[in-house]
Amino acid sequence: MKCSLGLEKCPDDTLRCFPKIEQPFGIVIFGASGDLTKRKLIPALNRLFEAGILPERFFVLGAARTKMDDKKFRSRFDANPDFLEHCSYISVDYQDPESFKQLKNTIETLIKRIDSSNLVFYLAVPPDLYIPILENLSKTGLNEKPARVVIEKPFGKDLESARRLEDTLQKYFQEDQIFRIDHYLGKETVQNILVFRFANFIFEEIWNNKFVDHVQITMAEDIGVEHRAGYFENVGLLRDIFQNHMLQILALIAMEPPSSFNGENFRNERVKLLRSIRPFPVEELESWIVRGQYGRGVVNGKEVPAYREEPGVAKDSNVETFVAMKLFIDNWRWSGVPFYLRSGKRLPKKITEVAVVFKKIPHSIFAGVPSDELEPNTIVFTLQPNEGISLEFQVKRPCPGMFPQLLSMDFRYEDYFGVKLPDAYERLLLDVILGDPTLFMRRDDLEVSWELLDPVLKAWENDPVRFSPYVYPAGTWGPREADLLIERDGRKWRKL
């Protein structure tokens, strides 16, 4: 089958398959002196430039409180010199309307140079700066269409703050101008979940409670909080991972097929699925959610400190670095099927996978092989690293007698296509510039996820002794209580 470019085989650089941006544009990055800009945004734009996707006329304007000139700004990045010629910098006080008037003058000069008012404002700043920036963009008229605004997680700290942020956003920008970015939705392997489900009838027919026993989603990191202690102390892992990445992956695995893959149809089904998740019973929360915090331990052969010993972390901090939970989706497709989710820092390895575990056979016809000893069929989506899909099934062992053995049939992107997968930010920045909202979150996306998790957060805050996190040694798969969460149901976490 040929792609949109008429190619039967992907080029070595899959970015060359992406649509070229024809219209000139400008992108203004607030927080341009920060880590996200250096690690992700500028490298992604540079890759789009080198792949020939960006138009001849465009500009990248960095804006931050740090004082520096264009030359110093450009020197921060390892990028194509021709790309860097399109980059400039202005120092901005986010709280000062006069500073935004100077910003507007600079933008107007750049707009004349490219002959286009197609503008993107990217807020790569802490969440407490969102509202003053949005207000000052409005005061200077920079919020008018066709301008678009991109905001990063966390989208608020709870339901109330998320609604305040959304009220401000929608006071100054219309919904089709707002792009709430969750970079996990930009990953090629995450999007492949949809193709696997909805382009293969054989799998979609068994994707329900008649055949599926349970689903496991694991997002593990071997690193600690690193230089993000200040941020993490105010957020914690439930807000940082579950409110966005984890629930979005869950939605892709469990949602109903949209009538077409366009922005609204796709997002409607995603939200519908999230609304079907059963609320957690706060009075028996310990039976549904396990909270953990890493202690001292050994990761990858190296001794590492406990979370409370990390620079910038309070010595008596109760912030969680690990969460495991069980939840149910109350709809026809998934009624009765438990979903087990876990994520944590300082675990043995970095891996993100989704495992759809099917029911065991009802009866074994093989002598000496009880049905409960036969491992069930499992479909595994490995989202990172070594991205791919595996199907685990039983085969006959090559020996006398009928002895089944579990094997895995593996597809790996790199092995089959032999191409470099685009970074999530490359895809998502392209979509923002083109105005395609499909892979971005809507307001109701955010609110329904906060409605689910808000009671949990409030319970933790109201009774810190009862819900104090269990300490687990760094380099292990979390506290023992996380194992008990799934073992009480007669199941076990997959060995990763």
UniProtKB/Swiss-Prot annotation:
NADP(+) binds at residues 31-38, 65, 153. The active site is at 245 (proton acceptor). The keyword Thylakoid does not apply. GO terms for molecular function: glucose-6-phosphate dehydrogenase activity; NADP binding. Disulfide bonds: none annotated. GO terms for biological process: glucose metabolic process; pentose-phosphate shunt, oxidative branch. Signal peptide: none annotated. SUPFAM superfamilies: Glyceraldehyde-3-phosphate dehydrogenase-like, C-terminal domain (SSF55347), NAD(P)-binding Rossmann-fold domains (SSF51735). Pfam families: G6PD_C, G6PD_N. Its EC number is 1.1.1.49. InterPro entries: G6P_DH, G6P_DH_AS, G6P_DH_C, G6P_DH_NAD-bd, NAD(P)-bd_dom_sf. GO terms for cellular component: cytosol. The keyword Aminoacyl-tRNA synthetase does not apply. Pathway: Carbohydrate degradation; pentose phosphate pathway; D-ribulose 5-phosphate from D-glucose 6-phosphate (oxidative stage): step 1/3. It catalyses: D-glucose 6-phosphate + NADP(+) = 6-phospho-D-glucono-1,5-lactone + NADPH + H(+). Substrate binds at residues 183, 187, 221, 240, 345, 350. Keywords: Carbohydrate metabolism, Glucose metabolism, NADP, Oxidoreductase. Belongs to the glucose-6-phosphate dehydrogenase family. Catalyzes the oxidation of glucose 6-phosphate to 6-phosphogluconolactone. This is Glucose-6-phosphate 1-dehydrogenase. It comes from Thermotoga maritima (strain ATCC 43589 / DSM 3109 / JCM 10099 / NBRC 100826 / MSB8). The gene is zwf.
